[in-house]
A protein has these predicted regions:
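Charged, compositionally biased N-terminal leader segments and the immediate start
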Residues: 1-22
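Accessory alpha-helical DNA-binding modules that contact the DNA backbone or grooves
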Residues: 14, 24-231, 238, 243, ...
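Short amphipathic alpha-helical interaction patches enriched in hydrophobic/aromatic residues
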Residues: 14-21, 151-155, 442, 446, ...
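Two-metal-ion RNase H-like nuclease active-site motif
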Residues: 184, 342-346, 416
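Charged catalytic cores and adjacent phosphate/nucleic-acid-binding surfaces used
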Residues: 191-277, 281, 285-348, 354-374, ...
Length: 574
């Protein structure tokens, strides 16, 4: 059993325990185990095979270690099976719907005998949900919207989940005899925040052995198509993968075609037609040439050059102005991970982080950062161990001590301060003034009407001590919708006030999304890219934020934490 399946089973256990109203700390332990497993780069089966102590992993105690060993050795988890026998499986699916959750899922199941998404939709449409105590018409509308979102995105994988399935497959395929080139195309290559399926393109002197090896991959659950140059498999995780072996002379054209997006390809082909050319997945052809000779196609840049375009990075290929920009000349170089000089949002053991301040500082210095920010939660988030004024002063004293031991990196003291329901901040003004940076976030009251939510955020941003608005829409991809608010107005006001907006690199957030980032840049907003790391390993999530920024067309000059410290510090002042 591979890491994605292990993480999925732990997530399932946590869901069932939540339905059963188990101890919140036990539920949290399983969710922490999910995060640990998902952040690993080494397969857990190797840990088990090499008899390495699994308890060395953060968040993995003896019970979790035994569970992992059992899953690796048997392919299942008896404890999970016992739990599932106690709870209708349909309840798990119901609680994953945006706008429902475990308590409401249990209620609709118990009182209306609803056991499927289809039955829930029928009950919502005929008004039975609204009649339940504690629900009402507004809850019913949100459930219907959640069902629609679930059907659109529920079967899609987050980028890291897809990576942990795709990378081992690529390594396996690269051992195929006759394989000359292999790349991933599709939304995976464009680095979309969720992935539905995977497209692989290859060049091979002998296509058949590559296809046979592909279909023999140990993680295959089903074979949907078995051809000489194209095959389709479904992995045990449910991820569908297509592999095509194409001729070398048309590889670049095929890579463009299967990378997409559809909108990008339509505009590209239209531009070709205007020039008497035809672009397909096989190459570029002269429409007036009776011989139907391919005039370009081996490399992507050759295809773009035939229609007088500079090469367009895959992340930008969404049909949102990138072709028009490339027609004017080479596109600006997009931001890279190595451009970033600091991480401005992370947590320590003072709240819900897994590492001490010193450990986080050492890890940031090892990554070559010039500066970093410690930003633990404020007191209203009781489950995270948020800090009140007294504990915050104690933390400042520790930061001063760590600063003295680490002159190689600037350590800024900050806090991720909750925006309360009325828009006030969860920390006294005197303490806010003592922070180097003030980060503010929404962690509650996600269901406020859009106008009230907008007023709430605007009030918080208007506080003179606020510097950064973190994960602005509070979304959790595939799990929680963005809060309803006038984001355009909020971004405009943030630009006027000099408040930066965060691109949170956590793959289950990636908040702001690419289109909002593009708008933020157009409005003159300051933008920062942070990890929101809760453990050392999560500092490496920065690359997902950078990929999202690249999708928005951002350069290093568009992001504040690419600046040297003195310039960064000046830029962050209001």
């Amino acid at each position: 059993m591979e890491n994605p399946e292990i993480a999925r089973i732990f997530e399932e256990v946590a869901d069932v325990l939540e339905i059963q109203n188990e101890n919140p700390f036990r539920i949290r332990a399983y969710r922490n185990a999910v995060r640990t497993v998902e952040s690993l780069t080494t397969p857990l089966r190797k840990w088990v095979e090499e008899n390495r102590p699994l308890t060395d992993l953060q968040g993995i105690g003896k019970e979790m270690a035994n569970h992992i060993k059992e899953m690796v050795e048997t392919g299942t988890l008896g404890f999970r099976d016992e739990l599932l026998a106690e709870v209708p499986r349909s309840l798990i699916e119901l609680m994953r719907l945006p706008g429902l959750g475990p308590k409401k899922a249990r209620k609709v199941y118990d009182e209306l005998k609803i056991g499927s998404v289809d039955e829930l939709e029928a009950a919502a449409r005929d008004g039975r949900i609204a009649s339940l105590p504690g629900f009402g018409a507004k809850s019913q509308e949100k459930i219907l919207a959640g069902i629609q979102e679930y059907r659109q995105h529920g079967s899609r994988f987050l980028l890291p989940q897809a990576e942990r399935m795709v990378e081992p497959l690529l390594g396996y395929l690269r051992e195929s005899p006759g394989l000359e080139r292999l790349e991933v195309a599709g939304s995976y290559r464009r680095r979309k925040e969720t992935i539905g399926d995977i497209d692989l393109l290859a060049i091979a002197s002998q296509p058949l052995p590559v296809m046979e090896r592909f279909r023999a991959y140990p993680q295959v659950d089903k074979i949907l198509n078995a051809g000489d140059t194209k095959s389709t498999i479904v992995l045990g995780s449910g991820l569908q993968v297509d592999l095509r072996v194409v001729p070398a002379e048309g590889y670049g054209a095929a890579l463009i075609y299967f990378t997409g997006s559809k909108e990008h390809n339509v505009k590209l082909r239209r531009r070709a037609v205007e020039r008497g050319l035809r672009i397909s997945e096989y190459g570029v052809f002269n429409e007036h040439d009776g011989d139907n000779e391919c005039i370009a196609g081996r490399e992507e840049a050759d295809v773009y050059a035939t229609v007088r375009l500079s090469w367009i990075p895959p992340e930008m290929r969404e049909g949102r102005g990138e072709i028009e920009a490339a027609a004017k000349g080479p596109l600006p170089e997009l931001i890279r991970v190595e451009d970033l000089r600091g991480d401005l949002h992370m947590h320590s053991t003072w709240s819900d982080g897994r590492n001490s301040i010193e450990e986080m500082v050492t890890a940031c210095a090892a990554r070559g950062y010039e500066y970093m920010v410690i930003s633990d939660h404020s007191k209203s988030l009781a489950m995270t161990g948020g800090l009140d004024a007294y504990r915050l002063r104690l933390q400042w004293a520790e930061i001063d001590q760590v600063r003295a031991r680490h002159p190689e990196i600037r350590i800024l003291r900050a806090m991720e301060v909750d925006i309360l329901g009325d828009g006030s901040l969860d920390l006294e003004d005197e303490m806010l003034a003592g922070l180097d940076l003030v980060l503010v976030s929404l962690h509650s009251r996600f269901d406020l009407p859009a106008d009230q939510q907008t007023e709430r955020v605007l009030k918080a941003l208007s506080h003179p001590e606020v510097n950064i608005f973190c994960h602005p829409t509070a979304r959790l991809i595939n799990r929680r919708k963005p809060v309803e608010m006038d984001l355009d107005l909020i971004l405009r006001r943030a630009a006027e006030l000099g408040v930066a907006v965060e691109l949170n690199s956590s793959p289950n957030r990636l908040d702001l999304k690419d289109t909002h980032l593009k708008l933020a840049r157009e409005l003159g907003c300051k933008v920062v890219i942070d990890t929101d790391a809760h453990r050392i390993g999560e500092l490496d999530l920065m690359r997902y934020g950078v990929e999202q920024a690249r999708r928005a067309g951002l350069t290093a000059g568009d992001v504040m934490n690419t600046l040297p410290f003195e310039k960064f510090w000046a830029a962050m002042q209001r």
